[in-house]
Amino acid sequence: MIATLLSSLLLTGPISAGAETQGLLPAQDLLPDIGTSAGATLSIDQEMAMGDFYVRQMRASAPLIYDPLLTQYINTLGNRLVANANSVRTPFHFYLVNNDQINAFAFFGGNVVLHSALFRYTDNESELASVLAHEISHVTQRHLARAMEEQQRLAPLTWVGVLGSILLTMASPQAGMAGLSGTLAGAQQGIISFTQGNEQEADRIGIQVLQRSGFDPQAMPNFLQKLADQSRYVSKPPEMLLTHPLPDSRLSDARNRANQMKPHPTASSQDYLFAKMRILGMYGADENSLTPELLDKLSKGTVREQLAAKYGQAVQLYQAKKYDEARNLLQPLLAQQPGNIWFLDLMTDIDLGQNKSAAAIARLQNAMVKQNDEPVLQLNLANAYVQGRQPAAAIKLLHRYTFAYPNDPNGWDLLAQATATQGLRDQELAARAESLALSGKLTQAIGLLSDASARVKLGSLEQARYDARIDQLRRLNERFRKYQKS
């Protein structure tokens, strides 16, 4: 039932003409581009604005993982798929929620959310990519906007209530489903039918996106089969089947379409294996996910898997605060790959865990000679500067980082720490305000910026900048209030 609502779609207008016909499927199986069919309900600008609103609400209420390495990985993977999709009119943003239930969804503004459990239950990168391709296809086909049109035909609906229930579902699936059911009321059956059609449509288009992006198209039916098998042996089906209906026809259709494509077995990237190790070792309720059996299996596998096993062992040792053992395991890996950001990030954490900020700073500065624009290294170095009591250096680097990545709370939080250490109260307040604004706490953010403005010289450039930002946030707050009332 949620699947239609859980998926946003704002995109239209093909990226490249003829991309759908490049030997992917027989002509009769190709799907028409229907991305513009929902234009009567919401414009792209309106969807973008609503997406911004709900992303901010999500930051405030959902257990998002703000891990720079994982954020960079899922956005790189996601945008690789987006580059091979049609009807893309907005940027895409991918988020990771710390949730042990298998699920993913998309909503307004090209925003796609993955549960961390997907890394636990996917056997390879193609399976993970198949989930992303499915959600991206929901977006490019504008299924959420089309669902709104369908709902308007069936019965009035408060869409803020629906999307609010979606966000609640991330933290508490049962409560979210209950809230959604109450909102949908008597129109449920029509929406359910519409949803099942959307799911199959997203599968069909997603398989094409998957293949064009260089992944194995069989990964989609394989993962769907895995979900179906799991539901047969447990009393409660996987959460993903509650939000993404899986009738037999959907599974058989996905398998048939994948079988029509040229086989394309694809090895998982090193980054996928590292990300899997990191999530198993650092996130989720199960502290025993990085089992000796799994690490032993990987250590006997391919070269990439062997390297992932060593990284996983180092993560495990770091989490147990066995810093010397973790360092001894990681040091040879760094010697072989001195620019590897996964190794550099973990070694920085080990250094800071042992109060060796000077060593971390020296290593990161050396790495940034060749990777000056690498955001993961910038954040690591800024954090090392803060921990090493070099706030001036941190502030300089973080001004650059927050300018390039204004929607990352990590940068603003570190900047607030650094400016506080320097006694720059107005700048600290402004940085804290930006972090609050990203979580939708606009009234509080405006209050902090007003305080910052009052602390600087009357008529100064700093005051003009703070006041201009206050005006922006006030306008944004007024717009968001309309969404909350609608």
UniProtKB/Swiss-Prot annotation:
Give the EC number. 3.4.-.-
**InterPro entries, alphabetized:** Mito/Outer_Membr_Metalloprot, Peptidase_M48, Protease_BepA, TPR-like_helical_dom_sf
Q: One Gene Ontology cellular component annotation? A: membrane
GTP-binding as a keyword? Answer: no
Task: Write down the required cofactor(s).
Answer: Zn(2+)
* Gene3D superfamilies per the UniProt record, alphabetical: Metalloproteases ('zincins'), catalytic domain, Tetratricopeptide repeat domain
- Please state where this protein is localized: Periplasm
Q: Where is the signal peptide?
A: 1-19
Give GO terms: molecular function aspect only: metalloendopeptidase activity; zinc ion binding
* EC primary class: hydrolase
Keyword check for Signal, yes or no: yes
Q: How cofactor binds (record note)?
A: Binds 1 zinc ion per subunit.
Q: One biological-process term from Gene Ontology?
A: proteolysis involved in protein catabolic process
Alphabetically sorted, this entry's keywords are: Hydrolase, Metal-binding, Metalloprotease, Periplasm, Protease, Signal, Zinc
Detail which positions bind Zn(2+). Answer: H134, H138, E199
CDD domains, A to Z: M48C_bepA_like
Q: Which HAMAP family match?
A: Protease_BepA (MF_00997)
Q: What does this protein do?
A: Functions both as a chaperone and a metalloprotease. Maintains the integrity of the outer membrane by promoting either the assembly or the elimination of outer membrane proteins, depending on their folding state.
Q: Which family does it belong to?
A: Belongs to the peptidase M48 family. BepA subfamily.
Which named protein is this? Beta-barrel assembly-enhancing protease
The gene designation is bepA
